[in-house]
């Protein structure tokens, strides 16, 4: 009996030690430091604070984009779509898609292609009456996106809510899905999408490397990764002006328009903490992507990085 009690006592001690180590390991993981803007915080705190930032700014997000960039963000996003060149049947994952700007442009692009093809088709047909022409357009209407689809994925439910309301208001319904999901752990199977885009979102991710690996995983072989993000200005004079504007003007705009100085102070700081164009290019390559390059827009205020899953 004494021997048995000794064995049981030893096993209980062993179990307590295992539990203690597991608890210590969990505590250590939760306390791993990262950055929230210029502040050092735990990884868990960063996730919570970033979520709160976008929860706070969701309803003023589009207005602030126009105000902060003086409307230039529209040109940057249009440029991204021109680089993408959507084709019929393309499946797009619009990560951190929030209020839908990239996906709406994607749908517009596909619709414009469809209209162009219908016009070309009708030009080659002779002696068409107006009812014939009208019927041709009506018959094509059901397949207006020609099998193309955009999945808008965002970790922030308030951003998705605002985006969905916006899509209904603007008449976008066909070919869109709205999914709550984490860029570091996507709720999709392997090899699902032709294109993965993330616009002004990846700098807010806690583990950028993990998000890049997930992007690679969900893309089909031959699929393309496209990232539009604030970057490092390569014009010395513009860089000085940009710094003054970023730190002295943007937080003020945030306070005046959105009644939220702190969120926009963080956004400015997060831009400065983001890797340079070459550093981010190397990170994309490390995730497995091939033929990685980037294009600077507005002297490097933003950059579009591109890579392929080959």
UniProtKB/Swiss-Prot annotation:
Pfam families: Ubie_methyltran. InterPro entries: SAM-dependent_MTases_sf (IPR029063), UbiE/COQ5_MeTrFase (IPR004033), UbiE/COQ5_MeTrFase_CS (IPR023576). Residues 1-6 form a transit peptide. Keywords: Membrane, Methyltransferase, Mitochondrion, Mitochondrion inner membrane, S-adenosyl-L-methionine, Transferase, Transit peptide, Ubiquinone biosynthesis. It catalyses: a 2-methoxy-6-(all-trans-polyprenyl)benzene-1,4-diol + S-adenosyl-L-methionine = a 5-methoxy-2-methyl-3-(all-trans-polyprenyl)benzene-1,4-diol + S-adenosyl-L-homocysteine + H(+). S-adenosyl-L-methionine binds at residues 99, 154, 182-183. It is found in: Mitochondrion inner membrane. Pathway: Cofactor biosynthesis; ubiquinone biosynthesis. GO terms for cellular component: extrinsic component of mitochondrial inner membrane. The keyword Transferase applies. CDD domains: AdoMet_MTases. GO terms for molecular function: 2-methoxy-6-polyprenyl-1,4-benzoquinol methyltransferase activity. It comes from the Eukaryota. It is a peripheral membrane protein. Its main location: mitochondrion. One of its GO terms (biological process) is ubiquinone biosynthetic process. It is an enzyme of class 2 (transferase). Its EC number is 2.1.1.201. Methyltransferase required for the conversion of 2-polyprenyl-6-methoxy-1,4-benzoquinol (DDMQH2) to 2-polyprenyl-3-methyl-6-methoxy-1,4-benzoquinol (DMQH2). Component of a multi-subunit COQ enzyme complex, composed of at least coq3, coq4, coq5, coq6, coq7 and coq9. HAMAP family: MenG_UbiE_methyltr. Belongs to the class I-like SAM-binding methyltransferase superfamily. MenG/UbiE family. This is 2-methoxy-6-polyprenyl-1,4-benzoquinol methylase, mitochondrial. It comes from Xenopus laevis. The lineage of its organism: Eukaryota, Metazoa, Chordata, Craniata, Vertebrata.
